[in-house]
């Protein structure tokens, strides 16, 4: 029976969970604030991992920039704790990147809901005009 997920996907999923726990409990840098791990991409040889994060106050570009810098500075510490938490021969080198997809998704959702609301208002106005 074939496996549903490849090893890299399983490792990435476990890394996402472990890094989220590490950021919540171990990283004390105030620049990181409330960081959420939204995804992890691992290379096929498990040597590199790209960690996608979002921040609580990510409306300000300076907050995002300083948060990413703090995470990159702490990547060695996070990697050491990750090595203790996971049983891997080689712990991947971590690179942190901001995940704008969540913010973009919320923006698109707001645009769609505004269009639906405007459309409903136009329909009700057109229905009132037809009745008169």
Curated annotation (Swiss-Prot):
GO molecular function, one term: ribosomal small subunit binding
Pfam families noted in UniProt: RBFA
UniProtKB keywords: Cytoplasm, Ribosome biogenesis
UniProt xrefs under PROSITE patterns: RBFA (PS01319)
Highest taxon of the lineage: Bacteria
A GO cellular component annotation in the UniProt record: cytosol
Segments traversing the membrane: none
UniProt keyword Cell cycle, yes or no: no
Gene3D superfamilies in the cross-refs: 3.30.300.20
InterPro entries, per database record: KH_dom-like_a/b, RbfA, RbfA_dom_sf, Ribosome-bd_factorA_CS
Keyword set includes NADP: no
Family: Belongs to the RbfA family.
Functional note: One of several proteins that assist in the late maturation steps of the functional core of the 30S ribosomal subunit. Associates with free 30S ribosomal subunits (but not with 30S subunits that are part of 70S ribosomes or polysomes). Required for efficient processing of 16S rRNA. May interact with the 5'-terminal helix region of 16S rRNA.
Assembly behavior: Monomer. Binds 30S ribosomal subunits, but not 50S ribosomal subunits or 70S ribosomes.
Protein name: Ribosome-binding factor A
Species: Edwardsiella ictaluri (strain 93-146)
Upper classification of the organism: Bacteria, Pseudomonadati, Pseudomonadota, Gammaproteobacteria, Enterobacterales
Recorded name of the encoding gene: rbfA
